[in-house]
């Protein structure tokens, strides 16, 4: 696979720099950008894909809602990024029953583009302080757990994906595989 340009949108989560380092270690050209970067500046970078990082609160998600609706490149939302995608397209997010980080067993419901090779079950590291409660209309439900019904989803027609868990941390089994699957989507788009 060629070297892709992947921009990591900083939503002020504690793992943002780890996402950046993991993407770089997978031989991609990457850069962290503030979540208030104007769309024109992002497009001028000519990215092959965007990763929306996790973060502490939706009120600090900057322009993420605009990014997922208006930028035509593959997008992967992680944790808060996943929730921002859901909200941008009319889904609902609520406080989870189990806050804090924990190891979770996720059931893969559909091994689509980004979850290929991860099923039928995989162990992940996730926080469920907030979680997607209702999928946006038409979105495909990709994974669930006993802690959270909507662990992963994708847009019905665009290459936009969300996962509640953190593929960038070592506690997540097959996290790098998920990222490489996302890069393949970016490469083919």
UniProtKB/Swiss-Prot annotation:
EC number(s) stated in the UniProt entry for this protein: 6.3.5.2
GO cellular component: cytosol
Catalytic activity: XMP + L-glutamine + ATP + H2O = GMP + L-glutamate + AMP + diphosphate + 2 H(+)
Pfam families recorded: GATase
Active site (catalytic residues): 79 (nucleophile), 166, 168
Domain Glutamine amidotransferase type-1: 5-189
Keyword ATP-binding annotated: yes
GO molecular function, one term: GMP synthase activity
Alphabetically ordered keywords of this record: ATP-binding, Glutamine amidotransferase, GMP biosynthesis, Ligase, Nucleotide-binding, Purine biosynthesis
Pathway(s): Purine metabolism; GMP biosynthesis; GMP from XMP (L-Gln route): step 1/1
Transmembrane segments: none
SUPFAM superfamilies per the UniProt record, alphabetical: Class I glutamine amidotransferase-like
Subunit details: Heterodimer composed of a glutamine amidotransferase subunit (A) and a GMP-binding subunit (B).
Stated role: Catalyzes the synthesis of GMP from XMP.
Matching NCBIfam families: guaA_Nterm, PRK00758.1
Protein name: GMP synthase [glutamine-hydrolyzing] subunit A
Species: Methanosarcina mazei (strain ATCC BAA-159 / DSM 3647 / Goe1 / Go1 / JCM 11833 / OCM 88) (Methanosarcina frisia)
Organism classification: Archaea, Methanobacteriati, Methanobacteriota, Stenosarchaea group, Methanomicrobia
